[in-house]
């Protein structure tokens, strides 16, 4: 008995449909979104690496001003020092190595109890701190992408960016960021540039390049060897037409 061609086509499509239903959940499971960003490394000295069982299984060197994701493992060598600010709740942690910690939504936990004794100092930052700090990794990435070989690069359409006048919402947010900076700066050690970073993140959101230049230079006075801040300064100066050729 021969099967009619239309029946063969029907069964072929049916098999493909069933196979797709079986494979679709597996494909979705294999395409999980990356873990959420939960914090920012604001200070780092010595050797430290990070990895994540979900998205970054191979350890890589940690960097200052690098964002931290939920589930990140951070391993600090002997003598290493690392500070993290968590966006939710404004928790600031200062860790001393050797230690291995795991980042959670509002803070870190030591991988083992033996590394948690006398290894961390905790402070709580102003509630306004998280908004500006969240923008810092993207801002620094812009600065790096806008430079090549240490020379400011501009596309033909960019030209000089003048500081713009923000709308009412922007003016309110900038005013709050300035007030938070003044309070925060008075309570922070001189070499800590976290208050400057928070203000820079807000100013960048509204293209306040002239004020950004002053804030970056202030931060560089506190950390003159910080290469990320040097890159950011040249990027801002490029926006103002002051790039060194």
What are these regions (language model features)?
Residues 12-25:
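Bacterial N-terminal signal peptides
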Residues 198-203, 233:
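Structural register within alpha-helical repeat arrays
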């Amino acid at each position: 008995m021969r099967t009619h061609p239309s029946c063969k086509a029907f069964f072929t499509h049916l098999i493909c449909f069933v196979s797709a239903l079986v494979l679709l959940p597996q494909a979705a499971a294999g395409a999980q979104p990356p873990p959420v960003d939960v914090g920012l490394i604001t200070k780092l000295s010595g050797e430290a690496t990070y990895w994540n069982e979900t998205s970054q299984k191979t350890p890589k060197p940690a960097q200052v001003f690098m964002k931290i994701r939920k589930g990140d493992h951070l391993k600090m060598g002997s003598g290493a020092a690392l500070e993290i600010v968590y966006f939710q709740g404004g928790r600031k942690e200062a860790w001393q190595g050797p230690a291995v910690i795991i980042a959670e939504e509002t803070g870190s936990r030591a991988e083992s109890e033996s590394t948690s004794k006398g290894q961390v100092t905790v402070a709580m930052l102003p509630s306004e701190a998280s908004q500006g700090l969240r923008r810092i990794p993207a801002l620094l990435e812009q600065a790096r992408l806008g430079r090549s070989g240490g020379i400011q690069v501009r596309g033909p359409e960019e030209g000089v960016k003048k500081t713009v006048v923000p709308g009412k919402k922007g003016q309110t947010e900038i005013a709050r960021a300035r007030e938070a900076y003044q309070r925060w700066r008075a309570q922070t050690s001189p070499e800590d540039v976290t208050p400057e970073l928070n203000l820079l993140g807000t100013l960048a959101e509204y293209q306040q390049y002239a004020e950004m230049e002053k804030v970056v230079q202030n931060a560089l006075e506190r950390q003159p060897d910080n290469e990320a801040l040097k890159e950011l300064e040249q990027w801002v100066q490029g926006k103002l037409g002051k790039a060194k050729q």
